[in-house]
Amino acid sequence: MLTARTRHLNRLRRCAFEDTGRLEGVNPQESRPSQLDIASWEYSEDFVAPSEAFRNAHAAALEDGLPAVTSGTAAMLTFLARLVSAQAAVEIGTDAGVTALSLLSGMAQRGVLTSVDPEAFHQETAREVLKEAQIATNRFRTIASNPLDVLPKLRGGAYDLVLINGDRLEYVEYLSQALRLLRSGGLLIMNDALASYHLADPDNQDDDTLIIREALESVQQTEGLTTSLVPVGVGLLLAVKD
């Protein structure tokens, strides 16, 4: 018997690109970077020298087989948190502490990050990362539970920044909750917005890519957002709520 998620994914495969075979404005012939493009990407990734704390956290995450954002993504997260002077932020998916370190490094001095992840081990690792970086423990609030059970209980309109970086198959649901949580002028960040650079390939119909396409289309159709799609790391979707 097909689950609701499987039926939904099958509908996306049948319908998502029937007319154009791609997202509007994306040319599949131009989606694969040349060698010069790759060199430019690598240069931009390394432009901001990562801190020792980031290097240690990133290396530890990879050694443990845990996901970790690139140095360019980390630098962008710090920059964006500083840009909006974030006092209160939520991250969906703890990412072994690398994203938490990046966000808290840019947030206001007493800013608090709430991190929601179903895996307690990820959050324990994150606490160790932040301890080594000498970030106060009261600035990092962890909730080890299914984000879709937790997010509806958080106060709407109370957060300056929300990072989506959890289960890719839940991105559409995360997106809805993230927009509810943001204050007016708050910033939404969605990691892996280019689906590990598979997004522009119309032949790629894997589950993660289909859901990320759907999430991006939802953002495009949502009024009251100012958006940008940035090819840093594996892609960041940025959206400011009116």
Where are these regions (language model features)?
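A short alpha-helical cap/connector motif
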Residues: L2-L161, R168-I189, A193-D242
